């Protein structure tokens, strides 16, 4: 069923948005074989995914997702693409608790590890949070706690057809890009880390097409799909349809530079320990990189007018104990639901 699309992409031709949506519909309906899915994803990766193609894929997945509604008028997602291969701790997931502690609701979309040792779901489980709650419970958690984890397989059941081929080919594919673009709650504000600097404008353009209000799409010069503190980061801002790109350095907000080794992660247990330490107020590079990523997420949500103000909010979230309290509140809520 996917043969025509494979042939076109292998020939180096781009799919229209409608053609891309049709291809994803075929995959999500279970009408493509694992070999066809793997061939299609690999050919796309070699050609390079275009704005129309990614938009079509995202619209198809959004149509099939279980929607989540919330009472929060403003909320943010910190889901990135993953796939940067740098094996850091879970920076954006830790930052999500800092954002929530600062008073901005977070609908964190995520999954288990695909290419790293520990995905966001893996770390949250190590922190004591059951991740595969049904959608109605996730919605209540978001409304009552101000933070929830939207586990992709629960909301995007049809993704199961691509899971095997993705795992077996072991390379970054269009699906890495689709995580941040298919939040089931339709997060209007986002911080999106991408694994390739050439993707920041592309992903920002797709988010604009999909109706995002404000987003920061970021890539660290060290290869991180995060705002880094080891050197400059490429930042592409989408704000009410307008897109601009600039360079950020840690010195811009008075943060010291660090080495990539200072941000290293490990197993889910290791990463959970790092997250707990950061949220408890331990100072150092891990805290600094979490702070700056939380600051950009707070800026995306409109919680501050400047990055410096947003950074101060993030610092206060940790130092007041609010970020750690948000983690404990989420653990307690999920435990009470499961009891």
Curated annotation (Swiss-Prot):
Record: residues binding anthranilate 1: 80, 111
Recorded metabolic or biological pathway in which this protein acts: Amino-acid biosynthesis; L-tryptophan biosynthesis; L-tryptophan from chorismate: step 2/5
Disulfide bonds: none
Binding site for Mg(2+) 2: 225-226
GO molecular function, one term: anthranilate phosphoribosyltransferase activity
UniProt-annotated binding residues for anthranilate 2: 166
Residues that coordinate or bind 5-phospho-alpha-D-ribose 1-diphosphate: 80, 83-84, 88, 90-93, 108-116, 120
Essential cofactor(s): Mg(2+)
EC main group: transferase
GO BP annotations listed: L-tryptophan biosynthetic process
Cofactor comment: Binds 2 magnesium ions per monomer.
Assigned EC number: 2.4.2.18
Swiss-Prot/TrEMBL keywords: Amino-acid biosynthesis, Aromatic amino acid biosynthesis, Glycosyltransferase, Magnesium, Metal-binding, Transferase, Tryptophan biosynthesis
Annotated positions binding Mg(2+) 1: 92, 226
InterPro entries found in the cross-reference section: Anthranilate_Pribosyl_Tfrase, Glycosyl_Trfase_fam3, Glycosyl_Trfase_fam3_N_dom, Glycosyl_Trfase_fam3_N_dom_sf, Nuc_phospho_transferase
Reactions that this protein is recorded to catalyse: N-(5-phospho-beta-D-ribosyl)anthranilate + diphosphate = 5-phospho-alpha-D-ribose 1-diphosphate + anthranilate
GO CC annotations, alphabetized: cytosol
Signal peptide: none
Assembly mode: Homodimer.
Function according to Swiss-Prot or TrEMBL: Catalyzes the transfer of the phosphoribosyl group of 5-phosphorylribose-1-pyrophosphate (PRPP) to anthranilate to yield N-(5'-phosphoribosyl)-anthranilate (PRA).
Similarity annotation: Belongs to the anthranilate phosphoribosyltransferase family.
NCBIfam families: trpD
Protein name: Anthranilate phosphoribosyltransferase
Organism: Moorella thermoacetica (strain ATCC 39073 / JCM 9320)
Organism classification: Bacteria, Bacillati, Bacillota, Clostridia, Moorellales
Gene: trpD
């Amino acid at each position: 069923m996917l043969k025509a699309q494979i042939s076109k992409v292998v020939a180096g031709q781009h799919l229209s948005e409608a053609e891309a949506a049709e291809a994803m519909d075929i995959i999500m309906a279970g009408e493509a074989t694992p070999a066809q899915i793997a061939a299609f994803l690999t050919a796309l990766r070699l050609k390079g995914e275009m704005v129309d193609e990614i938009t079509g894929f995202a619209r198809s997945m959004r149509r099939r997702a279980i929607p989540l509604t919330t009472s929060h008028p403003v909320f943010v997602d910190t889901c990135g693409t993953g796939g940067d291969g740098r094996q850091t701790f879970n920076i954006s997931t830790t930052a999500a608790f800092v954002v929530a502690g600062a008073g901005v609701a977070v609908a964190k979309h995520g999954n288990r590890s695909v290419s790293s040792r520990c995905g966001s779901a893996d770390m949250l489980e190590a922190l004591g949070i059951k991740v595969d709650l049904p959608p109605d419970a996730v919605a209540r958690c978001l409304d009552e706690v101000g933070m929830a984890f939207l586990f992709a397989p629960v909301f995007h059941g049809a993704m199961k057809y691509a899971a095997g081929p993705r795992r077996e080919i072991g390379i970054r594919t269009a699906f890495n890009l689709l995580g941040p673009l298919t939040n089931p709650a339709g997060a209007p504000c986002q911080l999106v880390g991408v694994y390739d600097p050439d993707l920041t404008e592309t992903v920002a353009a797709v988010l604009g097409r999909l109706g995002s209000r404000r987003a920061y799409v970021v890539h660290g010069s060290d290869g991180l799909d995060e705002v880094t503190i080891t050197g400059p980061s490429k930042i592409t801002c989408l704000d009410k349809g307008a897109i601009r790109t600039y360079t950020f350095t840690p010195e811009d907000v008075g943060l010291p530079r660090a080495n990539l080794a200072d941000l290293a992660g490990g197993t889910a247990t290791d990463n959970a320990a790092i997250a707990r330490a950061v949220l408890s107020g331990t100072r150092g590079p891990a805290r600094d990189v979490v702070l700056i990523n939380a600051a950009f997420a707070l800026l995306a949500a409109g919680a501050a007018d400047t990055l410096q103000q947003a950074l101060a909010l993030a610092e206060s979230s940790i130092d007041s104990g609010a970020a750690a309290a948000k983690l404990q509140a989420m653990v307690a809520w999920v435990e009470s639901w499961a009891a």
